[in-house]
Amino acid sequence: DYKKALKAEDPNPEDLFLHDFAPTPILEEKGERAPKNKEATVMVDSALFAIKEIMAEHPESLLYGQDVGKRLGGVFREAATLAQTFGDNRVFNTPIQEAFIIGSTVGMSAVGLKPIVEVQFADYIWPGLNQLFTEVSRSNYLSNGKWPVSCIIRVPIGAYGSGGPYHSSSVESVLAQIRGIKIAYPSTGADLKGLMKSAYYD
């Protein structure tokens, strides 16, 4: 109430960044980055294998976004076979509505689910930036560390070929300025798989 608030201590300046992020169990790299006698994989397959392993082990995980469900499995085929393996309730398509794709992670996380979502191309993320900035990135801070939104937002960028002015943007320098989110930009298939799995447990 109001009187109780008046008697509360002033915020401590040292606590300003206390709840930018929830504590993480991932503090160091484990395992072999490129195991011997294993065939090298392309980035797309590394993404597929990482998501498949996560979904097999964690029933609370979901994958959704533009064209990731059903038979297509993403425009780069990084979700191929996942809908057939895990069903349409866990791998599904969404409308072409990035604000919904990103914003829905807040509600999904609130009920104990852990969404992995995809914005089809980096250029498309701008309509979802409001949800990313005002809801997802601030969730842990605004709840005093009690309710962090836990999700992975996949944003394909720098893929093979070129896609003209609406499919070729590099957005990482803008996103990296948002406090409360972590950006991973893998350069190898091993990095992609490791970072994806680390992000899930973070």
Model feature map: region roles:
Residues 1-15:
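Active-site or pore-adjacent capping/gating segments
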